[in-house]
A protein has these predicted regions:
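Conserved "HGTGT" condensation-loop signature of ketosynthase/thiolase-family condensing enzymes
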Residues: 1-114
Length: 114
C-alpha cells in the first residue's frame, strides 16, 4: 500500500488508523510505504507517480521504501509492516495507492496481477 506519508498530524495517523479499521488484522500482512518520501510533493503529478510505483512493485516484486524515516510517532501501531528505509523483495499480487490532494481531493486506485 502506497500512502501519502506527508508527516503531518492531520494525515499520517488518521490514515493509518482508517486503513487498520477497514482491513482489521489483515493490515499486518501488507507492506505500507510512502514513495512521496523519495520524490517530494509533486502536486498534480503525485498520484500518477505513486500509481507508477505500485505498477513497478507488481512488475518487479519490489516494495519501495519510505526513506529517511528515523523516528515513528508513538501513536503508530508498532505491528504494522512499514517498509522503512530499504526496499523489500516480495511477491506482490496487488497494490493500492491512496492519494489525498490539496483542497480535499481523495482517490484510491488498486492494481493487481492477472
Amino acid at each position: 500500500m502506497n500512502v501519502p506519508g506527508t508527516s503531518t498530524p492531520a494525515g499520517d495517523i488518521p490514515e493509518l488508523k482508517a486503513v487498520a479499521g477497514v482491513l482489521g488484522d489483515h493490515v499486518y500482512d501488507i507492506n505500507i510505504s510512502s514513495t512521496k518520501s523519495m520524490t517530494g510533493h509533486l502536486l498534480g503529478a503525485a498520484g500518477a507517480v505513486e500509481a507508477l510505483a505500485c505498477i513497478f512493485a507488481l512488475t518487479h516484486g519490489v516494495v519501495p521504501p519510505t526513506i529517511n524515516c528515523e523516528n515513528l510517532d508513538p501513536e503508530i501501531d508498532s505491528k504494522l509492516n512499514l517498509t522503512l528505509n530499504t526496499a523489500q523483495k516480495r511477491d506482490v499480487k496487488c497494490a493500492l495507492s491512496n492519494t489525498f490532494g490539496f483542497g480535499g481531493h481523495n482517490s484510491t486506485v488498486i492494481f493487481r496481477k492477472l
